[in-house]
């Protein structure tokens, strides 16, 4: 019986030992067609040949870095606590997860010279596919300034439900970036098929002009302590692009292409939300949002081109696209190129401010706005609250009003020889400070600001020149002081016969009144002031009528005393006639 008990205990112990032995197997490799399992991940990596596939069987933390090209499979995580890893091959996470921590507790990589200023010096490719992920986390207080320092032809691929993330800690005031490209030829970042890319908290996000291609995915750079990006080609198809809360530029490109229902959101960046030196192209299905940017020493919503290369860059926003530029602390739209917004683009430029000129739009290139573009409630400290133009602007039928400028040109400021083409004001526009309907364009110059409600500083003068001009003009969409005409219809004693009419219009505009047909009355004469011009004082126009008898009144039988007098006479005559008839009958 005791012996049987010993056998049971031995069997249980052996089972537990075998179970623990199996649990210690952390990875496997195929060797000569057979699967070989390893209890030590460093041993598995060392045994692997270039381009081998290692299947992870558990989460692992290697102690040694490597050069060779490897693919890791299995839904487990491989974690390195290192800095200065020099890698020149192709590393693929196929459903697996790579984490590289370069912060407290990190050790230098052991394959060659290990620079402290980077987590990885990349000369090859990093790829996450099929739900795999790659994460870099670094602390600049520990001397690590870059997550990735990339050499020529280095690429990052994030494909098929994969994720890529760089997290920077304590980066403010420390030169460095999430991704630094030494040379850009052949390098790029490619994010496709329901994948995501995130740089969060780096000093600069990515720099030195890589190609970035995002399709059916999300791409975000946020909370950087300097520029989020720098140059290159950026193309988005059916994707959501976010550049948020960065202390420098948001999306900085050489060429920007947005299509297939993509949304680009650049919000709360210290410099420009979006800036492109060469090209901006947006198709009819996509949306651009660039709000609340430009709170640094430069910046704004969108900038196309550079002041040194006027009309060399090109912008095309297709009909149906939506562009919103709101609440920026500098020019909402700054254009040095040839920028065209097609008809039926939804363009809203509102509530922007600038310490100089052109809070809504500063244009030095050639700019065409769509009909019904909204440019309103923008405030410039100097000139051109709505638009400041020193190039060519076509703003036909744009809703350009209720903007403000500190010195001149609340809505429009056009410098000499610049071309400005615009339209008459619309009858449904009204001023925001008095709620009066806008009736025309008025001069709003530095010497004499438009002012209709202050008698001491009263100045109201309509702009009466061409709506296509190369002259220096400063204009405001506004209204004249309103005059009132009261039209009354009275009899000769001054009694009102019908209700009076009130008419209002701008001072010095013409007015014209008319008489009314009133039963049993006829007009005595047409008043001398039946026509005239509106004045500051109210004008009363009096139409006087006299009463007349109608044909019906002349045919009515007499009444009253006359009728009482004729009744006895009629009766007497009737008696005489009857008496005559009676006498005649007697004789017969």
What is the meaning of each model-derived region?
Residues 1-7:
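Bacterial N-terminal signal peptides that target proteins for export
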Residues 8-17:
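Bacterial N-terminal signal peptides
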Residues 23-46, 51, 300, 319-321, ...:
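Extracellular/surface-exposed low-complexity segments
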Residues 53-86:
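N-terminal extracellular ligand-recognition/capping segment immediately after the signal peptide
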Residues 75-90, 104-123, 133-155, 163-254, ...:
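Extracellular beta-strand/beta-solenoid scaffold signature
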Residues 443, 451, 479-550:
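Extracellular modular ligand-binding repeats in secreted and cell-surface proteins
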Residues 559-572:
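Juxtamembrane/start-of-transmembrane alpha-helix segments at the extracytoplasmic/lumenal side
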Residues 572-588:
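C-terminal membrane-anchoring or membrane-association module
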């Amino acid at each position: 019986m005791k012996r049987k008990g010993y056998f049971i205990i031995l069997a249980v112990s052996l089972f537990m030992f075998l179970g623990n032995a199996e649990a210690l197997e952390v990875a496997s490799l195929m060797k000569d067609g057979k699967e070989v399992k390893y209890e030590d991940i460093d041993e598995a990596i060392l045994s692997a040949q270039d381009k081998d596939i290692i299947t992870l069987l558990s989460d692992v933390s290697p102690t040694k870095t490597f050069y060779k090209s490897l693919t890791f499979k299995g839904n487990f995580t491989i974690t390195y606590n290192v800095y200065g890893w020099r890698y020149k091959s192709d590393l693929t996470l196929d459903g697996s997860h790579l984490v590289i921590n370069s912060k407290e507790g990190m050790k230098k990589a052991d394959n060659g010279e290990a620079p402290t200023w980077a987590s990885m010096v990349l000369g090859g490719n990093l790829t996450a596919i099929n739900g795999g992920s790659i994460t870099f986390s670094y602390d600049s207080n520990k001397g690590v300034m870059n997550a990735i320092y990339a050499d020529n032809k280095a690429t990052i691929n994030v494909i098929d439900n994969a994720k890529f993330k760089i997290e920077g800690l304590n980066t403010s005031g420390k030169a460095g970036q999430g991704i630094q490209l030494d040379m850009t030829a052949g390098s790029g970042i490619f994010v496709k098929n329901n994948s995501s890319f995130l740089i969060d908290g780096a000093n600069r996000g990515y720099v030195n002009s890589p190609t970035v291609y995002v399709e059916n995915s999300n791409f975000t750079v946020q909370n950087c302590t300097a520029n989020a990006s720098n140059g290159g080609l950026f193309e988005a198809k059916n994707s959501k692009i976010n550049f948020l809360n960065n202390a420098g530029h948001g999306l900085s490109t050489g060429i920007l292409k947005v299509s297939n229902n993509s949304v680009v959101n650049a919000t709360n960046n210290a410099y420009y939300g979006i800036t492109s030196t060469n090209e901006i192209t947006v198709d009819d299905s996509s949306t651009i949002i660039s709000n609340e940017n430009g709170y640094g020493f430069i910046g704004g919503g969108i900038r196309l081109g550079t002041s040194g290369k006027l009309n060399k860059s090109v912008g095309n926003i297709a009909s149906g696209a939506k562009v919103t530029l709101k609440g920026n602390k500098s020019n909402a739209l700054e254009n040095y190129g040839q920028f065209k917004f097609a008809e039926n683009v939804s363009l809203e430029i509102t509530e922007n401010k600038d310490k100089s000129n052109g809070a809504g739009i500063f244009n030095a290139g050639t700019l065409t706005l769509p009909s019904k573009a909204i440019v309103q409630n923008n405030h410039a400290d100097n000139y051109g609250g709505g638009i400041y133009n020193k190039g060519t602007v076509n703003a036909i039928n744009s809703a350009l009003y209720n903007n403000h400028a500190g010195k001149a040109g609340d809505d429009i400021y056009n410098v000499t020889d610049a071309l400005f083409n615009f339209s008459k004001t619309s009858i449904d526009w009204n001023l925001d400070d008095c709620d009066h309907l806008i009736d025309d364009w008025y001069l709003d110059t530095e010497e004499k600001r438009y002012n209709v409600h202050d008698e001491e500083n009263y100045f109201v003068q309509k702009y009466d020149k061409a709506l296509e001009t190369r002259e220096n003009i400063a204009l405001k969409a506004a209204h004249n002081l309103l005059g009132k005409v009261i039209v009354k219809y009275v009899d000769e004693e001054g009694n009102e016969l019908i209700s009076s009419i009130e008419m209002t219009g701008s001072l010095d505009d013409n007015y014209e009144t008319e008489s009314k047909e009133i039963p049993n009355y006829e007009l005595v004469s047409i008043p001398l002031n039946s026509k005239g011009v509106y004045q500051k004082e109210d004008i009363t126009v009096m139409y006087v009528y006299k009463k007349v008898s109608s044909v019906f009144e002349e045919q009515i039988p007499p009444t009253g005393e006359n009728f009482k007098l004729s009744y006895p006479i009629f009766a007497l005559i009737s008696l005489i006639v009857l008496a005559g008839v009676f006498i005649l009958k007697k004789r017969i």
